[in-house]
């Protein structure tokens, strides 16, 4: 095996370049134009998106980004770059970053690796649970960006890692660390990003993966169904999404006697707007208003050592041995 010829591309969803309405509008436009995300008829969706949704949502979302923006960049970008650096040190291989939407583009990341002499590229979408809305969208971007290229790079793409032992171990250790530092709550709620129920009805395996991740995490922590559960957050639009919804679940827990809650989002590999603002702040308010007394938000795995170890193990298993 010639490690010098192998390179790694970490892929995440993307982020606005700045916490401004203009930057958020540009990012959301690209994201919500993807048929993997919204498959509504284009003649209906595009006028609705540009005439109603973006003008209203962009300024509101920009204010939310301002509340979590870090000194150097957005949280998603900062933590993603830390992952790149840590994984590169761990593997002693070139590692680059690509975003499905926005910059740096997936193609830019691949070209950067090729410039470093990589002729075998392992693409690791940082979505533990597969979905057409995330992992499949990465496939689409690669196909679109290399549509007119005569000779394609040698790609190997990771499909999912929802049940990888090191992933489950890393999640469990992050929860145990929270218990050690902040005390153990009555219940652990695993809040996953939601997708339309219709996508699952049409064959998306995302929900199956989320359920399995939760089951394995419960086993690792030694928790029963009265001590751990799952829900889905970030619903968009009026269509039915995967249930139970996190917002509704939070309203029900305290009246059932669960007065202290630990909440984690296993589907996110790095902290971002959906975890730092929605899960940490909005959801806390819902739970406390419903009668909760203690709400502990557990951060994403980010560049945690066990998380990087997991990535390294996955990549190493994909590199050619010939």
Swiss-Prot record:
Any transmembrane segments, and where? none
The EC number(s) attached to this protein equal: 4.98.1.1
Locations listed in the record: Cytoplasm
List ligand-binding residues for Fe cation: 193, 274
Enzyme's top EC category: lyase
In the UniProt record, does the keyword Heme occur? no
Catalytic activity annotated for this protein? heme b + 2 H(+) = protoporphyrin IX + Fe(2+)
- Tell me which InterPro entries the record gives: Ferrochelatase, Ferrochelatase_AS, Ferrochelatase_C, Ferrochelatase_N
Q: Which GO terms describe its molecular function?
A: ferrochelatase activity; metal ion binding
Kindly state a single biological-process term from the GO annotations of this entry.
heme biosynthetic process
- What's the domain of life for this entry? Bacteria
UniProt keywords, alphabetically: Cytoplasm, Heme biosynthesis, Iron, Lyase, Metal-binding, Porphyrin biosynthesis
**Can the keyword DNA-binding be found in this entry's annotation?**
no
- A matching Pfam family: Ferrochelatase
Q: In which pathway does it act?
A: Porphyrin-containing compound metabolism; protoheme biosynthesis; protoheme from protoporphyrin-IX: step 1/1
Q: What does the UniProt function comment say about this protein?
A: Catalyzes the ferrous insertion into protoporphyrin IX.
What family does the Swiss-Prot or TrEMBL record give for this protein? Belongs to the ferrochelatase family.
Quote the protein name from its UniProt record: Ferrochelatase
Q: Which organism is it from?
A: Aliivibrio salmonicida (strain LFI1238) (Vibrio salmonicida (strain LFI1238))
